[in-house]
Amino acid sequence: MQHDLHPEYSEVTIQLADGSEITTRSTMETDSYETEVDSTNHPFYTGRRQFVDTAGRVEKFNRRYGLTDDDEGDDEETEDAADE
């Protein structure tokens, strides 16, 4: 059997977003860990919906692929010309 093969397994205190603490065992090298999102405030567990910044994501997509607001109107003009 090999010695020193597995990482150290020690107690860690996890502090949840609401301030409560849980003590468990982990291979983490720190004695404590703070979470921002957990089951007390995550929308999946609470049933509350949160607004996601989709507008920022759309703008990022348009910047990445070179689309601008002016390009959106060009499709309609092309379709009108094709109908004539």
Curated annotation (Swiss-Prot):
Q: Which SUPFAM superfamilies match?
A: L28p-like
Annotated spans, Disordered: 1-41, 63-84
Query: InterPro entries, from UniProt?
Result: Ribosomal_bL28/bL31-like_sf, Ribosomal_bL31, Ribosomal_bL31_A, Ribosomal_bL31_sf
- Kindly list the biological process annotations in GO that this record carries: translation
Acidic residues composition bias: residue spans: 68-84
Q: Which keywords describe this protein according to UniProt?
A: Ribonucleoprotein, Ribosomal protein, RNA-binding, rRNA-binding
Molecular function via GO: rRNA binding; structural constituent of ribosome
Q: Which domain of life is it from?
A: Bacteria
- Bias-annotated ranges (Polar residues): 21-30
| Xref: Gene3D superfamilies | Ribosomal protein L31
Under the cellular component aspect of Gene Ontology, which terms does the record hold?
ribonucleoprotein complex; ribosome
Family, per the entry?
Belongs to the bacterial ribosomal protein bL31 family. Type A subfamily.
Q: Which HAMAP family match?
A: Ribosomal_bL31_1
- PANTHER family assigned to the protein according to its UniProt record, in alphabetical order: 50S RIBOSOMAL PROTEIN L31, CHLOROPLASTIC (PTHR33280), LARGE RIBOSOMAL SUBUNIT PROTEIN BL31C (PTHR33280:SF1)
On subunit structure and binding partners, the annotation says:
Part of the 50S ribosomal subunit.
According to its UniProt entry, what is the function of this protein? Binds the 23S rRNA.
Question: What is this protein's name?
Answer: Large ribosomal subunit protein bL31
Which species is this UniProt entry from?
Answer: Salinibacter ruber (strain DSM 13855 / M31)
